[in-house]
C-alpha cells in the first residue's frame, strides 16, 4: 500500500510535461539524498555513448539514400495521417529505453509533428532564434543566447532550471548545432552539448559551478538529430533526442523507470508543441520582425524575400557524421 501511494504521489507531481533533458535531473534528485556520492563520468560510459551515436549516425546515413524514406512518417500512411490531423507522436527508439550502459543510462526518444501553413523557413527561424529560446521554451529555459554563428553552424548557451519536490536543479549548457540542406524543401540539423555543468545550490548564497563531468551525474551528454520536410501544405518535423545520464540504483528502478519513460514522452511532446506554436507566429515572407524591423532567419537578422529556403540557412557541404562532431568537441 505504501509503495502504491508513493507512486501516486510522485506521478501527481510529474504529470505536467517538462522541456527536454532537464527532467531526468529532477527525477533522480527525488531519490538521491543530498549527501549522495559524486558520480564522475567514466571512460567506459563515454565509450558506450560514442558507440551508440555511431549507430545513430548509421541510421541517419541510410535516410540520406534515395532507397530509404527520409521521414518515419513515410513508412506508414496511417502514421502520416495522424500527424496531418494534428497529433504529436512520441515513442522510444527501442523497447528497452532507457538503455543501460556501464555506469550510465541512454535515453533515446523520437518525436514527430506536422505544422500546416508553415514553411521550412519558418521552422528554421524558430530553431536558430536562440535569443528567444527563453521565451519559446519557458519555464525551463530561463536564459539563452548565441555564442558564435556562421552560415550553417551555431554555438549557443542555455540555462535550464527545474524545481522538484525537494530541490531546484540548474544546468549550465553550451550547444553546437549544424544545419544541412537537402534541396529546397528538405534538411536536417545535428545538435550536441559541448559543455554541461551543474550549478550546485542554485538560487542560494552558496551557488557554485561544478567542473564538467563532475557532480551528481544527472546529465552528462545531450544529442539530437532533427529532420524537416516541407510538403502537403506545411512542414514535417522529426526529432530524435538522445541523452546520457547516471544510472539509477537497482533498488529504485521499479519506481523511477516507468516515471522516466512517461515524463520523457511528455517532455518531448511539450518541446514539439512549443516549436509548433512559435513557428506559427514566425514572420511571414514580406512581413517584418517587431524586434529589429526586418525578417530574421537565424541569429543574425536578414531581409527575407524569396519563398524558398535561403542559401545561408543550411550547409551544402559534405555531411559530417555525429561521431566525428563529438570526438572533435569532447
Regions found by a protein language model. Give the residues of each.
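Extracellular/cell-surface secretome signature
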Residues: 290-330
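Bacterial N-terminal signal peptides
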Residues: 20-33
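N-terminal secretory signal peptides that target proteins for export/translocation
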Residues: 1-19
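Secreted/luminal cysteine- and crosslink-motif detector
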Residues: 13-14, 23, 74, 293-296, ...
